[in-house]
Amino acid sequence: MLPVSNPSSPEHLLKKSRTPDSTTSIDRKNSFNSLHSVGNRSSYIAASRSHCTWLILSLLSLQLILFLTLRSIPFPHRHIPENFPSPAAVVTTTVTTTVISAASSNPPLSSSSSDERCDSGRVFVYDMPKIFNEVILQQCDNLNPWSSRCDALSNDGFGQEATSLSNVIPKDLVQSWFWTDQFVTEIIFHNRILNHRCRTLDPESATAFYIPFYAGLAVGQYLWSNYAAADRDRHCKMMTQWVKNQPYWNRSNGWDHFITMGRITWDFRRSKDEDWGSNCIYIPGMRNITRLLIERNSWDHFDVGVPYPTGFHPRSDSDVVNWQDFVRNRRRETLFCFAGAPRAGIVNDFRGLLLRHCEESRGKCRTVDCTVGKCSNGSSAILETFLGSDFCLQPRGDSFTRRSIFDCMLAGSIPVFFWRRSAYMQYQWFLPDKPDSYSVFIDRNEVTNGTTSIKEVLERYSKEDVRKMRERVIDLIPNLVYAKSPNGLETFKDAFDVAIDGVFRRFKEQEKWYKWR
């Protein structure tokens, strides 16, 4: 627990004698003067006692008021500073735990209305050394071995405005569309959580503690070329060392802490030095921390899948409603579609099989071949294809999930899955419990061996079935996108809100029945 530095209280109260000092003896020879002297002295004693009593009571009251006032003020915890070297250069960073000042991000302060809206809990954001977030962003030119990431990480992580989509989407929504990179959830979550109405500056009142470390961006620059395992692990080791020195981590052993890791979980699960990725999740200290990832390990309780960022970032509720109306009324002339690229050199490549299957479907399927264009962060061709199709095929990507799942659903197209781990076992906080209410599942093995035709399966759905499923997909849109407004939407809960609510719910449940020690 962070020690509160109470002001020095007085070591002792000011003490006054209850009786006056001894005086000269009374002259007994003059009884009148003697009686008069005694009377004066009695009055003096009574007055002195009264004044002393009021003085003591006043001091006690003042001390009580001062104690109660100062007790409510969070004071920074201080401990022995540690110095961490920057991966880019030898930089000395003094590590101290400080409470973020309200002026730094102007979080909503406590009020009766906000108290009512924060029944689920409050979140405290660690003020970490900048080497864990800001410095990483400042090195955006070096985060990718092939090109600069600066444009992709600009604009609070939303990227450049997608003005070229003006011929595809309603003009009044163009300002809500961006060329958003799929690996920027760390930036988006950090900016939003600093402005969250339930953020607290008092760690004693926190239900959850957020670690604003950009783990995915930090490791991304070391995933390729000839970097050693130590390079890929460096940032995460520094982070866990810092966090484990925080008193609130030590109080719970990390079970009420959470972090956003903006890549798939497998980028942080290296078992051997020669394997891919970092070993961040396996570093001591990470075991009990809840991790928000765009792809989770379905067998790890502490991994939570959150939606990939899409290009749509609504500014208000009206943006959401207008987009829902647009995709609901869109004329769809194609039964199904597929956007992707085959993987050369992979035996029985399923994506290549789907491309061939589409080509053989005689106008029922539309494709976007991503071998000849950039598809990872969306394009007008992909958006138009999804907007014009009833169903969109969603095989696994390089891992079990793809950003395309969310691009597809955002366009009001019904996803068709071939792996249950692509969505059903990934995004339980965001998708309905009944998968068939919004999606179709087809056994990939039956497609591969030719016993099942995708076209025939999808043609069995009536127009009314398709309408109901599409309506369910459209209803989900607010929960799958990240709002542009730093304070979120007015009444809709976006993906960030759903994630934070889930974290609060999980921590309250864990506190009752489940702690790893």
Curated annotation (Swiss-Prot):
<keyword id="KW-0328">Glycosyltransferase</keyword>
<feature type="transmembrane region" description="Helical; Signal-anchor for type II membrane protein">
    <location>
        <begin position="50"/>
        <end position="70"/>
    </location>
</feature>
<keyword id="KW-0812">Transmembrane</keyword>
<feature type="compositionally biased region" description="Polar residues">
    <location>
        <begin position="20"/>
        <end position="31"/>
    </location>
</feature>
<feature type="glycosylation site" description="N-linked (GlcNAc...) asparagine">
    <location>
        <position position="250"/>
    </location>
</feature>
<dbReference type="InterPro" id="IPR004263">
    <property type="entry name" value="Exostosin"/>
</dbReference>
<keyword id="KW-1133">Transmembrane helix</keyword>
<dbReference type="GO" id="GO:0000139">
    <property type="term" value="C:Golgi membrane"/>
</dbReference>
<feature type="glycosylation site" description="N-linked (GlcNAc...) asparagine">
    <location>
        <position position="377"/>
    </location>
</feature>
<dbReference type="Pfam" id="PF03016">
    <property type="entry name" value="Exostosin_GT47"/>
</dbReference>
<comment type="function">
    <text>Functions in xyloglucan synthesis by adding side chains to the xylosylated glucan backbone. Involved in galactosylating hemicellulose xyloglucan (XyG) at the second position of the XXXG motif to form XLXG. Associates with other xyloglucan-synthesizing enzymes to form multiprotein complexes for xyloglucan synthesis in the Golgi.</text>
</comment>
<feature type="topological domain" description="Cytoplasmic">
    <location>
        <begin position="1"/>
        <end position="49"/>
    </location>
</feature>
<feature type="glycosylation site" description="N-linked (GlcNAc...) asparagine">
    <location>
        <position position="449"/>
    </location>
</feature>
<dbReference type="GO" id="GO:0008378">
    <property type="term" value="F:galactosyltransferase activity"/>
</dbReference>
<feature type="region of interest" description="Disordered">
    <location>
        <begin position="1"/>
        <end position="31"/>
    </location>
</feature>
<dbReference type="GO" id="GO:0006486">
    <property type="term" value="P:protein glycosylation"/>
</dbReference>
<dbReference type="GO" id="GO:0009969">
    <property type="term" value="P:xyloglucan biosynthetic process"/>
</dbReference>
<comment type="subunit">
    <text>Interacts with CSLC4, FUT1, XXT2 and XXT5.</text>
</comment>
<feature type="glycosylation site" description="N-linked (GlcNAc...) asparagine">
    <location>
        <position position="288"/>
    </location>
</feature>
<dbReference type="GO" id="GO:0005794">
    <property type="term" value="C:Golgi apparatus"/>
</dbReference>
<comment type="similarity">
    <text>Belongs to the glycosyltransferase 47 family.</text>
</comment>
<feature type="topological domain" description="Lumenal">
    <location>
        <begin position="71"/>
        <end position="517"/>
    </location>
</feature>
<keyword id="KW-0472">Membrane</keyword>
<keyword id="KW-0735">Signal-anchor</keyword>
<keyword id="KW-0808">Transferase</keyword>
<keyword id="KW-0333">Golgi apparatus</keyword>
<dbReference type="InterPro" id="IPR040911">
    <property type="entry name" value="Exostosin_GT47"/>
</dbReference>
<keyword id="KW-0325">Glycoprotein</keyword>
<protein>
    <recommendedName>
        <fullName>Xyloglucan galactosyltransferase XLT2</fullName>
        <ecNumber>2.4.1.-</ecNumber>
    </recommendedName>
</protein>
